[in-house]
């Protein structure tokens, strides 16, 4: 288990080119090819994971299944994102299409949250860069819809994440970016957007 540090930024579309030039000037390079990412988030009927995240409680977790729709070789990752007093870490396991279908139908049982069913679908485009030991991801064209609901909401802003192990100093890199740090969860943001009006 490796704890990690995450910092998130909101960037307006009109500032994206400036941001990319900035990170390129300090030595950031492409880590992977850009790709489309799809995640289905699970929660219990009371949305306790959502509520814990909104309130910033520790420990808390999010459960999702992630895949990359445009990949020729389709695969699915069952992921647990866990936040604790000690730090954050992620546990994931590759699962088959059959197992994914079973989880969507039957749900996932969690010791703390009980039976969790699919709640929210999120799809977006992600770019991957790296600077020293800090991984930088840029998420654009973020779309949300409640599971089994055709109503789609889009996010106009761009989300940037800086991620590194807890032993690395991320603050020095973060200070080079004149953008606002935020607490942000795609799961919570999607639920909020889709519940407006």
Language-model segments: residues:
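Phosphate-end processing signature that detects enzymes handling 5′-triphosphorylated RNA
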Residues: 1-197
